[in-house]
Amino acid sequence: MKLLKIYLGEKDKHSGKPLFEYLVKRAYELGMKGVTVYRGIMGFGHKRHMHRSDFFSLSPDLPIVLEIVDEEERINLFLKEIDNIDFDGLVFTADVNVVKMG
């Protein structure tokens, strides 16, 4: 089994809609086992720009993380599907040992 993690910003868009929503819908259409989306309260990336949620932030671009655990073949298919999407984020995979599913 593989873990796919995708880090992106809350403001990242695809066809005018939130990118994370597009990615979840695409994963669903491809029959992925499941996707979890996390919304961070604070973080920074390789550009070292701090993103955070507080009262004074009028328009925060908070970190969004998608996690998918699935068979390697499905992860690779999903990666090919999203390869042409341009966003400023991080995508990586890792081998995982699933102890329990379902």
UniProtKB/Swiss-Prot annotation:
- Pfam families, from UniProt? DUF190 (PF02641)
The family database entries (Gene3D superfamilies) matched by this protein are listed as: 3.30.70.120
Which domain of life does the protein's organism represent? Bacteria
Coiled coil (residue ranges): none
Q: Which InterPro entries does the UniProt record give?
A: N-reg_PII-like_a/b (IPR011322), N-reg_PII/ATP_PRibTrfase_C (IPR015867), UPF0166 (IPR003793)
Does the entry annotate any disulfide bonds, and if so which pairs?
none
Name the family the entry cites: Belongs to the UPF0166 family.
The protein's name in its UniProt record: UPF0166 protein TM_0021
Q: What is the lineage of its organism?
A: Bacteria, Thermotogati, Thermotogota, Thermotogae, Thermotogales
